[in-house]
């Protein structure tokens, strides 16, 4: 284990929307260090979102991330030989990270032809409270609700 917590590294806002969240999203989409390709995919998806919905693409993008953010999650805790799933609140930074991760993973598992289409459709679904990423959030909340009895094991 490390002696102290690793310092948070600053994230540069992206050049198009001047947003750190978009940069984090691009970094999550990126594979093998191909950032230019990841940028093309994310910006293309946001543009497509704007054509799909009646709102601006970037507004739908933020709405999608907001809708997928989990408020509660379960974490394993060992107590006297038994492992309990303890529901806990999620810190805001982790909420954002999980939201981005779930959206990107859900987009990768979709069946559309290009990643731009997959990402745009997943973001659109998430903005409208449906789709695989939103379902993942609901499942997480359901798990936390089911294990509410173990909430007193929180640490």
UniProtKB/Swiss-Prot annotation:
Gene name as annotated: rpsG
PANTHER family: RIBOSOMAL PROTEIN S7
Family: Belongs to the universal ribosomal protein uS7 family.
NCBIfam families, alphabetized: rpsG_bact (TIGR01029)
GO cellular component, one term: small ribosomal subunit
Source organism of this protein record: Nautilia profundicola (strain ATCC BAA-1463 / DSM 18972 / AmH)
Keyword field: Ribonucleoprotein, Ribosomal protein, RNA-binding, rRNA-binding, tRNA-binding
Entry keyword annotation includes Ribonucleoprotein: yes
GO terms (BP aspect): translation
Database matches in CDD domains: uS7_Bacteria (cd14869)
Gene Ontology molecular functions: rRNA binding; structural constituent of ribosome; tRNA binding
UniProt function note: One of the primary rRNA binding proteins, it binds directly to 16S rRNA where it nucleates assembly of the head domain of the 30S subunit. Is located at the subunit interface close to the decoding center, probably blocks exit of the E-site tRNA.
Pfam families: Ribosomal_S7 (PF00177)
Name this polypeptide is given: Small ribosomal subunit protein uS7
PROSITE patterns membership: RIBOSOMAL_S7 (PS00052)
Subunit annotation: Part of the 30S ribosomal subunit. Contacts proteins S9 and S11.
């Amino acid at each position: 284990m490390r002696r102290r917590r690793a310092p948070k590294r600053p994230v540069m806002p992206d050049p198009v929307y001047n947003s750190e969240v978009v940069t984090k999203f691009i970094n999550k989409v990126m594979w093998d260090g191909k950032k230019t390709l990841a940028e093309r995919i994310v910006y293309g998806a946001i543009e497509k979102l704007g054509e799909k919905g009646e709102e601006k693409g970037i507004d739908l993008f933020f709405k999608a991330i907001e809708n997928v953010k989990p408020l509660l999650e379960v974490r394993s805790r060992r107590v006297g030989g038994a492992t309990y799933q303890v529901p806990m609140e999620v810190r805001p930074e982790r909420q954002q990270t999980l939201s981005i991760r779930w959206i990107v993973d859900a987009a990768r598992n979709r069946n559309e032809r290009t990643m731009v289409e997959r990402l745009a459709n997943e973001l659109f679904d998430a903005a409208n409270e449906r789709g695989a990423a939103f379902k993942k959030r609901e499942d997480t909340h359901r798990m936390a609700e089911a294990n509410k009895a173990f909430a007193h094991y929180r640490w």
